């Protein structure tokens, strides 16, 4: 029965479902996991890299973490070619706002604008939904640190801790059990690594398979900082959390 309704995004099934949107969400379920944890002094994003190779120039490639503006970053799960289009759209919108109003765009306003674009691709013929979900982490003067999650339907919501990608339901359940208000950034990093280590499909957890980024306020200046963890620092974090495992022989 579903085959009569799943060829176009503009046709509802008798049950009121848009199958193409649901299929886009299935694509995200096959992507590497990404977690976001909101702390009292920042936001932590951690992602699982699916592409690992000794030949890959890690300093020039990013698979999960992307900077949108000086105060806003995101983690991605899904089809990366789709994500790149939306990332460029988000960066352009942020720069236009800054040029017009001489201040950084509020985090939720940018998230809402991007989700409006995603929703439009579920409502018009000849288009397909973007097969990508985002975790947005940022800070603004209106609401402080914020964490948002969006999906291919164009829906978004604010979270204290969230997961997207493979095994996201199991990760979300663990976050619900272990998260508490008032976490420090250091505690948020430990929580995110712990959850990811138990939900990743990979049997070994190494620094080369993870990306970690933080959004926080620089002590003293109060400026928003976006910092990506280096593989060396990631290895130390894993060792400190007791999660470090030897990498398999190449």
Swiss-Prot record:
S-S bonds: none
A cellular component term, taken from the record's GO annotations: proteasome core complex, alpha-subunit complex
Protein name per its UniProtKB record: Proteasome subunit alpha type-4-2
Protein's job: The proteasome is a multicatalytic proteinase complex which is characterized by its ability to cleave peptides with Arg, Phe, Tyr, Leu, and Glu adjacent to the leaving group at neutral or slightly basic pH. The proteasome has an ATP-dependent proteolytic activity.
Family: Belongs to the peptidase T1A family.
Keywords from the UniProt entry: Cytoplasm, Nucleus, Proteasome
Database matches in InterPro entries: Ntn_hydrolases_N (IPR029055), Proteasome_alpha (IPR050115), Proteasome_alpha-type (IPR023332), Proteasome_asu_N (IPR000426), Proteasome_sua/b (IPR001353)
Domain of life the protein comes from: Eukaryota
Stretch forming the signal peptide: none
Subcellular location per the Swiss-Prot or TrEMBL entry: Cytoplasm; Nucleus
Gene3D superfamilies according to UniProt: Glutamine Phosphoribosylpyrophosphate, subunit 1, domain 1
Self-association and partners: The 26S proteasome consists of a 20S proteasome core and two 19S regulatory subunits. The 20S proteasome core is composed of 28 subunits that are arranged in four stacked rings, resulting in a barrel-shaped structure. The two end rings are each formed by seven alpha subunits, and the two central rings are each formed by seven beta subunits. The catalytic chamber with the active sites is on the inside of the barrel.
Coiled coil: none
The keyword Cytoplasm is annotated on this UniProt entry: yes
Induction profile: Up-regulated in the leaf sheaths of rice plants grown from seeds that were inoculated with the nonpathogenic P.fluorescens strain KH-1.
A GO biological-process term: ubiquitin-dependent protein catabolic process
């Amino acid at each position: 029965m579903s085959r009569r309704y799943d060829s176009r995004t503009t046709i509802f099934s008798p049950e009121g479902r848009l199958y193409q949107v649901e299929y886009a969400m299935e694509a995200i379920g096959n992507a590497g996991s990404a977690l976001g944890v909101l702390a009292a002094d920042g936001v932590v994003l951690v992602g699982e890299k699916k592409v690992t190779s000794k030949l890959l120039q890690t300093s020039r490639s990013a698979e999960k973490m992307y900077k949108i503006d000086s105060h806003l970053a995101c983690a991605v799960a899904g089809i990366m070619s789709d994500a790149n289009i939306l990332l460029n759209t988000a960066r352009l919108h942020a720069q236009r706002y800054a040029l017009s109003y001489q201040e950084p765009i509020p985090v939720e306003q940018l998230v809402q604008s991007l989700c409006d674009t995603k929703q439009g691709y579920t409502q018009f013929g000849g288009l397909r939904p973007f097969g990508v979900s985002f975790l947005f982490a940022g800070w603004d003067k209106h609401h402080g640190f914020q964490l948002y999650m969006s999906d291919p339907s164009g829906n978004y919501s604010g979270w204290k801790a969230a997961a997207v990608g493979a095994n996201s339901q199991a990760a979300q359940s663990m976050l619900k059990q272990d998260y508490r208000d008032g976490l420090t950034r250091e505690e948020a990093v430990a929580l995110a690594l712990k959850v990811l280590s138990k939900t990743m499909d990979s049997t070994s957890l190494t620094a080369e398979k993870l990306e970690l980024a933080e959004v926080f306020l620089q002590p003293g200046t109060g400026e928003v900082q976006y910092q990506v963890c280096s593989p060396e620092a990631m290895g130390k974090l894993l060792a400190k959390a007791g999660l470090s495992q030897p990498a398999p022989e190449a």
